[in-house]
């Protein structure tokens, strides 16, 4: 990615690593209710559907209808169920997949400043897969907390640590890594589309002198990246969410989950929750990339001031 100006000094790998994780956490704080609504819509119709405190399954309709229903039935706090696991995920996940992207891209280009589309795609796939290897348990927890109804006494998990213990006890160590295959696939796709699209749009805007390396450029690039990513990654995202939230033995594999979805509900099932996915991913990208660019600038400026003698 083209660096943000901080006295024309490029940000270090450490600055990118810390900045990416911090920016992703800030983006999650703003967009978590949209992500929760997306998860509820994606799993609607599963065997363990959300229930309205014993009065039958809750029906979710649309993004804001889902949010409204959750607030009415479960209270406002339900929109942030799983936030702790979500923030744990972003600090370990985004730091790797976004923060190390430029370093891995330079590795593939052998230090050259001219990166082709192939090296960008390879860098995106690599850091996306690496991030899943590090952060998968936190992703499993986040999805399960978002899927469970907060009202009533039938909650699967009561706290983040309780969830880690319960999953490890009932499902074994493998339970914490459930859905790793589809998640690696999803995040390789997401990372390639998201980072490479942002990279290319930003490069094009700067090289054509349509915009300068500032907030409007970052906003436009991030919004475009979010839209492209949602279209390409939605099918894998739905399979990942359903499989990670499924009861033990419900699906034999992620592929079995995908086949069951296709045979029972048709191709449209793979784009279930598309609008909340786009609203969430589009807004998340805007907040994250804008914050990330600002953090890189601020951290490099602070670093320069620290090393500048008075």
UniProtKB/Swiss-Prot annotation:
Keywords from the named record: Membrane, Mitochondrion, Mitochondrion inner membrane, Repeat, Transmembrane, Transmembrane helix, Transport
Function as written in the Swiss-Prot or TrEMBL entry: UCP are mitochondrial transporter proteins that create proton leaks across the inner mitochondrial membrane, thus uncoupling oxidative phosphorylation from ATP synthesis. As a result, energy is dissipated in the form of heat. Antiporter that exports dicarboxylate intermediates of the Krebs cycle in exchange for phosphate plus a proton across the inner membrane of mitochondria, a process driven by mitochondrial motive force with an overall impact on glycolysis, glutaminolysis and glutathione-dependent redox balance. Continuous export of oxaloacetate and related four-carbon dicarboxylates from mitochondrial matrix into the cytosol negatively regulates the oxidation of acetyl-CoA substrates via the Krebs cycle, lowering the ATP/ADP ratio and reactive oxygen species (ROS) production.
Mitochondrial intermembrane side of membrane: 1-10, 102-120, 199-215, 293-310
Organism, scientific name: Danio rerio
Gene name in the database record: ucp2
Gene Ontology terms: cellular component: mitochondrial inner membrane
Protein name: Dicarboxylate carrier UCP2
Membrane topology: Multi-pass membrane protein
Record's catalysed reaction(s): L-aspartate(out) + phosphate(in) + H(+)(in) = L-aspartate(in) + phosphate(out) + H(+)(out); oxaloacetate(out) + phosphate(in) + H(+)(in) = oxaloacetate(in) + phosphate(out) + H(+)(out); (S)-malate(out) + phosphate(in) + H(+)(in) = (S)-malate(in) + phosphate(out) + H(+)(out); malonate(out) + phosphate(in) + H(+)(in) = malonate(in) + phosphate(out) + H(+)(out)
Cysteine pairings via disulfide bonds: none
């Amino acid at each position: 990615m083209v660096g943000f100006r901080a006295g024309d000094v490029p940000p270090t790998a450490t600055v990118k690593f810390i900045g990416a994780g911090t920016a992703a956490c800030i983006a999650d704080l703003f967009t978590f209710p949209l992500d929760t609504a997306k998860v509820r819509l994606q799993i609607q119709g599963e065997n363990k559907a959300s229930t309205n405190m014993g009065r039958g399954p809750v029906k979710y309709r649309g993004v804001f209808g889902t949010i409204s229903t959750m607030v009415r039935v479960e209270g406002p706090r339900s929109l942030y169920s799983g936030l702790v696991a979500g923030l744990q995920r972003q600090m370990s996940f985004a730091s790797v997949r976004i923060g190390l992207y430029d370093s891995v891209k330079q590795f593939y280009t052998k230090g050259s400043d001219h990166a082709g589309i192939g090296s960008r795609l390879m860098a995106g796939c690599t850091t996306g897969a690496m991030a899943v290897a590090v952060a998968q348990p936190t992703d499993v927890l986040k999805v399960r907390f978002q899927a469970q109804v907060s009202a009533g006494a039938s909650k699967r998990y009561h706290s983040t640590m309780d969830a880690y213990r319960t999953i490890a006890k009932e499902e074994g160590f493998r339970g914490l890594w459930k859905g790793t295959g589809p998640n690696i696939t999803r995040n390789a796709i997401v990372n390639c589309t998201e980072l490479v699209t942002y990279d290319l749009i930003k490069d094009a805007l700067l090289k054509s002198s349509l915009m300068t390396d500032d907030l409007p450029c970052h906003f436009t690039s991030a919004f475009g990246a979010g839209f492209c990513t949602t279209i390409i990654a939605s099918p894998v995202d739905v399979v990942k969410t359903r499989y990670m939230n499924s009861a033990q033995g419900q699906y034999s594999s992620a592929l079995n989950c995908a086949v069951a979805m296709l045979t029972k509900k048709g191709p449209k099932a793979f784009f279930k929750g598309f609008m909340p996915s786009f609203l969430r991913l589009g807004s998340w990208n805007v907040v994250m990339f804008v914050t990330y660019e600002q953090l890189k600038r601020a951290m490099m400026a602070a670093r320069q001031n620290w090393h500048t003698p008075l």
